[in-house]
């Protein structure tokens, strides 16, 4: 199993804590995210909402997720792609 998948819940909790997210924000935007695949240093994450949600998450949480994934897993130069379930 990949380290990102293995530690996904921990990664999300760290982002929540370090960025002082409310439970509502966390449960709305981050908790529903799931790791689709990890290839080399690219993490593909499924956003189970419409395009608006994908755009918002990409703008607001992409960098915090990249930094936290790198810190927790040791993955250098981590890149993130967000996709919708139908992609």
PLM regions: where:
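Intrinsically disordered, low-complexity basic tails and flexible linkers associated
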Residues: 1-87
């Amino acid at each position: 199993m990949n380290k990102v998948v293995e530690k996904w819940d921990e990664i999300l909790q760290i982002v929540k804590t370090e960025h002082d997210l409310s439970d509502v924000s966390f449960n709305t935007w981050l908790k529903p995210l799931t790791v689709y695949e990890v290839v080399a240093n690219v993490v593909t994450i499924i956003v189970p909402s419409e395009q608006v949600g994908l755009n918002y998450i990409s703008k607001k949480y992409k960098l915090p997720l990249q930094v936290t994934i790198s810190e927790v897993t040791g993955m250098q130069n981590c890149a993130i792609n967000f996709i919708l379930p139908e992609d």
